[in-house]
């Protein structure tokens, strides 16, 4: 299991090194001499953000699995929403602790052996099961680059890194239908423009059977849970690995997922 995740990590790093310079080179001259607020920061003007957002939106809609484009879209359109989410975190004791301590979810911070040793049904064990079953790695989340505020940059980075945790909480797979359902939940929870766009336009690639289930059952379920649950960014998941997943769902007001979701795509 750990070997699978490490292989995914190496593959992502290889792809990232090949694709990332494209954007960096285009903006390096414009940002030369500007003050960098965090290691991967690329300062951009409002016009540059608008152009980046337009291009990223087109690519993300064409191929929703282009996580790099989804990331750019989120960073260039979500400034006001990120401020609201940051303020929500500051008002909550657990959220404020997260903002202060800045935990990261990656292969370098996760103790895979410990997660594997946790009881069946615990958050940590189920999260690891999700990663393994779907062949995904927490290291596939792109670093924040285009947010011109160090604290807000962490907020959107945290949102990205708990995305797979939301899949685990909601019981959603990583196929297109599962991603759309999670996007509806995230859209209600966060209000981020990229989540709203993903929720609205993601269904265009689904089959008729999946669309019927999506609109009749899954979207209402996701909206209801998104409204009922407190801000999911205020959950210090790393301190709750041993908590039973069912207990955490009850605490957050998240009802069990529909059982037939796994057979659809």
From Swiss-Prot:
List the protein's name: Ubiquinone biosynthesis protein COQ4 homolog, mitochondrial
The annotated subunit structure for this chain is: Component of a multi-subunit COQ enzyme complex, composed of at least COQ3, COQ4, COQ5, COQ6, COQ7 and COQ9.
Q: Where in the cell is it found?
A: Mitochondrion inner membrane
**Which residues are in coiled coils?**
none
UniProt GO cellular component terms: extrinsic component of mitochondrial inner membrane; mitochondrial inner membrane; mitochondrion; protein-containing complex; ubiquinone biosynthesis complex
Please state the gene responsible for encoding this protein: Coq4
Q: Which Pfam families match?
A: Coq4
Q: Does the keyword GTP-binding apply?
A: no
Q: How does it sit in the membrane?
A: Peripheral membrane protein
State its role.
Lyase that catalyzes the C1-decarboxylation of 4-hydroxy-3-methoxy-5-(all-trans-decaprenyl)benzoic acid into 2-methoxy-6-(all-trans-decaprenyl)phenol during ubiquinone biosynthesis.
Q: Which organism is it from?
A: Rattus norvegicus (Rat)
Residues binding Zn(2+): 163-164, 167, 179
GO terms of biological process kind: ubiquinone biosynthetic process
Q: List residues modified as Phosphoserine.
A: 108
